[in-house]
Structure formats: structure tokens, C-alpha cells
Amino acid sequence: MKVLLVGGGGREHAIGEALVKGGAELYVVSNHRNPGLMRLAKDYGLAKETNVEDVIKFARKWGIELAFIGPEAPLEAGIVNALEEEGIPAVGPTREAARLETNKAWAREFMERNNIPGRKMFRIFDDVQEMRKWIDEYGKPVVVKPLGLTGGKGVKVVGYQLKDNEEAKEYAEHIIRKDGKVLIEERTDGVEFTLQVFTDGKKVIPMPLVQDYPHAYEGDVGPITGGMGSYSCSNHLLPFITEGDFERALKTLEETIEAMRKEGYPYKGILYGQFMLSGEGPVLIEYNARFGDPEAINVLAVLDDNLLEIAKGIVEGSLRKAKFLNKATVVKYIAPQGYPQDPIKGIRIEVDEEGIKNEGAKIIYAAVDENLTLLGSRALAIVGVADSLEEAERIAENGVSYVKGPIFYRKDVGTRESVEKRIEIMKKLGKEFEPNLC
């Protein structure tokens, strides 16, 4: 089956690998040549991923039978709508359904309208004075969010990126003047986690839970990035998450998909809920209308099923199952020095693939070209899969040593110390649970 994959990051390399393993004849459109995908693809179209016309032309040329959309920007550009008009089914929501991610205000209002569990208190402002007055009256720490896509880097939280509510008002004013509107939310304290599901618009199949490390530097400090790494556990939960917490988070996504169908925006593809586990339970931080990056790499590394068959089930409305191995995973992203604010670009790195393989680790390429030249974003990920988290972390850590150049990574991704730190946060919030160190 001829399958088109849109996107060329680490997430897409992992998707492409799984599709080819499932028997797909792969064709890729991306704005750079990912060396991992180049080995997998029958043909590779270089084009802007949001240029719908170019993507459609490429799909026509090769007689594509199914498309799989990796990143969020093409979804916002209406790539799925255009492909479907061409008679090409796509794994990914339409432009209208993708608003769950692409328009944060719409998503919050949708949750409110449909009484979706895990909601946060929020307000949307287009008037600077009203916004300032409301924040003063509210008096508690807030979160400030632009309404559209920011690559995970536009959200600022009081007590983290913002010193206090005074700074929050300044930042919110800047967004109103730039975009016309701003979203203000209550701050929720706790530990974040990711739940991703496959859905055909009715049936919902959860994937193992994953925890991401968004901060650039060890100890969870520094600027927010696209994600410096992530881990998952062999029991598909996380050390601080009970079966009950998981069920509640899943209910949020199930009710979301049901409400989208009722509102006339059937949602098919991957839905990813970014949750905060608070003392009271899981609260939805935001929806994403596609796989997470790095989180896709974790779950696809343990997918014990055929991704091509799952993709067909999604587009045909006949989704049945998705099995995952009971293994732990650790993904460590390697980024250019200076990332995310001022990354080094244009310099080649050295990758000893044989050495990485001999350690039992796996390499996933991201923002490097076919010559392994740094393109300015996260360059590649090293993946460890094992029976225990400790062993998976050791494999990934050993694999990293075979990559040389002006790069950095977070040593603490998936380590026992960093996991225990998260368990401690939940205990301080009064959460009662029996931690498992997977």
C-alpha cells in the first residue's frame, strides 16, 4: 500500500519505521531530508509541509492510497481536508477538528460547553484593562497562553517563566497587542504526563503513558523546549499514577471524542492529552491533535502490532486493537548547543551507528540533513528499551556517547533520581499512592 507521510522530525522517523515494518510502501514530504526517512522512503519530496498544493501534487504523482500526518502545522493548514477531497484518506483530524490544538480558546470553550472532565478555570480577553483588572481580582497565580500554535514555547506560568502576576499582565498585554486575544488560566500544581490515543471517531484505544522533560537543562530548569526526552514504564502507567488516575484521564479523551462527533466535527487520528496530575486528580493542560515528539518514539518502540493496519482501521472507522509490549522505554534527545534560543546550525556531527546498535540502543533522526548537518532544532534521539526503566535508561545513556559534535543532552532523563523527584512532588500535594519505580 502506498502511504504518504507528511513531516521529517524524530516523531516522523519513528512513524515511518513502524509503517514500513507493517508493510507500507513509504513516500515522504518534508521541508528537509531526514537521513532515517531517506532510507525508508521510495521517494522523498522536499516541500513546505504546510504547502497543501505541493503535498497534493506529490500524492497525485505517486498514486498515494493513505496519508499519515506527523506535525500540527499542516493540520491547521487543512491538509486532511484537501487530501480527502482528492479521495485520499488521512490519519489526522480535519482543520475544524484540529482546533482542539490549533485554537486554545476554542478548545477550552468546547470543554466547558460539553462538561468534559478535567477542565481548568479560564478567561479569554481582548481588552487590556479588563484583563489587568481580572488578574488583580483573581489574586492567585495564573498561566498565560497565546491562542494559536507556538510549538509548545509560547505558554508562560507564574512561578516558572513569569515572576509574578505583574509580569503575567505585561506578557498578556504583549499577546493582546500582537494577536488581538489572550487566554488566561488558573495555575495547576502537580506533575505533567502524556496520554495518547488512537481513534476512528468512535473507538478509543489508549497507548502507554509517557512523561516528557520539557526544560532544556538538567534538574528541570531553563527554557521550555519541544522536549528533551521522555520515558514510559513496562506496566504502561507511571510511578506516581494509579489505575484510577489513568482511567480519569482516559475518560477526558473519550468524552472529548464523543462530544466532537456530536458537534459535527468527527475526530480521527491520534489525540494526545497533556495532563497535570494535581492533588485532586488529572487536569487537562492542553490537547494536541497528533503524536507527541518525543512521546511517539516511546510508544512506537513498544508497539506490538501493525501500525499500517491501525492506520487503515482509523480511516475506515473499523479500529479494533493495538497491543504494546510490557517494556520500559527511555528517549534522550540530543540538541545543538544554544538550543532552543540560539542554536548552532550548519555544523556536521558524527554518529557511530554501529556503536549505538551494539549498545542495544536505537537512533531516531530529527533536525539534521542527509549529511548530518545540524539544522537548529533537536538533532536526533537515542532510544533504550528494556524490562526495567533503569536498564532502558542505561542503554540510552550509553548510546548517547557515540554522537560527537557541538551538542548537549539531559543526562537525567529517565533516571531514578528524576523519577523520585516527581513522586516527592505528588506526595507533598497530599496524593496517596503506592509508587512503582517501573
From Swiss-Prot:
Keywords for this protein: ATP-binding, Ligase, Magnesium, Manganese, Metal-binding, Nucleotide-binding, Purine biosynthesis
Family matches, as PROSITE patterns: ATP_GRASP, GARS
Pathway: Purine metabolism; IMP biosynthesis via de novo pathway; N(1)-(5-phospho-D-ribosyl)glycinamide from 5-phospho-alpha-D-ribose 1-diphosphate: step 2/2
Annotated positions binding Mn(2+) 1: Q274, E286
Record: residues binding ATP: 135-194
Pfam families per record: GARS_A, GARS_C, GARS_N
Superkingdom, taxonomy of origin: Archaea
Domain ATP-grasp: 108-316
Binding positions for Mg(2+) 1 per the UniProt entry: Q274, E286
Residues noted as binding Mn(2+) 2 in the record, renumbered to the chain: E286, N288
The keyword tRNA-binding is annotated on this UniProt entry: no
Amino-acid positions noted as binding Mg(2+) 2 in the UniProt annotation, renumbered to this chain: E286, N288
Family annotation (InterPro entries): ATP-grasp, ATP_grasp_subdomain_1, PreATP-grasp_dom_sf, PRibGlycinamid_synth_ATP-grasp, PRibGlycinamide_synth, PRibGlycinamide_synth_C-dom, PRibGlycinamide_synth_C_sf, PRibGlycinamide_synth_CS
Cofactor: Mg(2+); Mn(2+)
Biological processes per GO annotation: 'de novo' IMP biosynthetic process; purine nucleobase biosynthetic process
EC primary class: ligase
Cofactor descriptive note: Binds 2 magnesium or manganese ions per subunit.
Catalyzed reactions: 5-phospho-beta-D-ribosylamine + glycine + ATP = N(1)-(5-phospho-beta-D-ribosyl)glycinamide + ADP + phosphate + H(+)
Family to which the UniProt record says this protein belongs: Belongs to the GARS family.
Family annotation (HAMAP family): GARS
Protein name (record): Phosphoribosylamine--glycine ligase
